[in-house]
Amino acid sequence: MSTNPIQPLLDVLYQGKSLSREQTAELFSALIRGEMSEAAMAGMLVALKMRGETIDEISGAADAMRAAAKPFPCPERNNNPLHNGIVDIVGTGGDGFNTINISTTAAFVAAAAGAKVAKHGNRSVSSKSGSSDLLAQFGIDLTMSPETASRCLDALNLCFLFAPHYHGGVKHAVPVRQALKTRTLFNVLGPLINPARPEFMLLGVYSPELVLPIAKVLKALGTKRAMVVHGSGLDEVALHGNTQVAELKDGDIIEYQLTPADLGVPLAQISDLEGGEPAQNALITEAILKGNGTEAHANAVAINAGCALYVCGITDSVKAGTLLALATIQSGKAFELLSQLAKVSGEAHVNGQERGR
């Protein structure tokens, strides 16, 4: 199919000018439909990268991908005063560190503490073991149907949504992204296109320069409340140093720093959080969720779960959130939740409910 309809938009980019939100959505819609050549795709991504993507351009790309995503049937939002919305705990990846699966493990803890967590994840980007790599170790079906995932969210407070299962059109960009061998707009899009459309987000970014822009994008996309964080090199709240935060609340964005002391836990070394292959990380996650993890592992997970609990309104401060997360870890409830999710996932698969996707 001819790429002529989008050529004028590409020409704008090649001239070093920016596109509107609607124009960017039009370009990315063409990409998702498979109507853009790989050469044009590479040109578009490089032109955006070299100039630096605007808030409108990131928002427009997210609009297109959200619109094209496989629908997710969200359970009733307001059937419980505590559950005034869904939260995601997610990072861009690509921070260059091979840590344990902090955000994935934190999702179990936050859910066991009362949050409704719909975690949007993919296979590994920078570490040896991404969210989906870890879940597979526990027998959690990465391709469970949207209906089964929704039932898990309703009954267990938690579901995991495997990005490629909901965003099939992204496959057209894979060869180009692999050939370019550099970060592109796609590296920040993943956390922005959760098909559950969470009202609340704890979103970690790989660069401190992205913290404020991504908070502005979340505001543009209609996110109710969020913390965008970069923790001393990590795409999550840091246990080994300061965390830069841009918090979106009531339509305003405020910037500040958090230290481990602010969260009520001692400083640790980044080496204390080193991860391994999926099988090794699964053992670490299991130990943490049973309350048997190292102090550093438990605290790293708790400060991230705690910030998520704060963002979705279950606690009124990040420190209170961290304390609730630590108590939840010690109770073993988070591991019970993991076991229940694996059981439901396995039963759905065996019963054939996952066929015909």
UniProtKB/Swiss-Prot annotation:
One of its GO terms (cellular component) is cytosol. Anthranilate 2 binds at residue 177. 5-phospho-alpha-D-ribose 1-diphosphate binds at residues 91, 94-95, 99, 101-104, 119-127, 131. Anthranilate 1 binds at residues 91, 122. It is an enzyme of class 2 (transferase). Pathway: Amino-acid biosynthesis; L-tryptophan biosynthesis; L-tryptophan from chorismate: step 2/5. HAMAP family: TrpD (MF_00211). Belongs to the anthranilate phosphoribosyltransferase family. This is Anthranilate phosphoribosyltransferase.
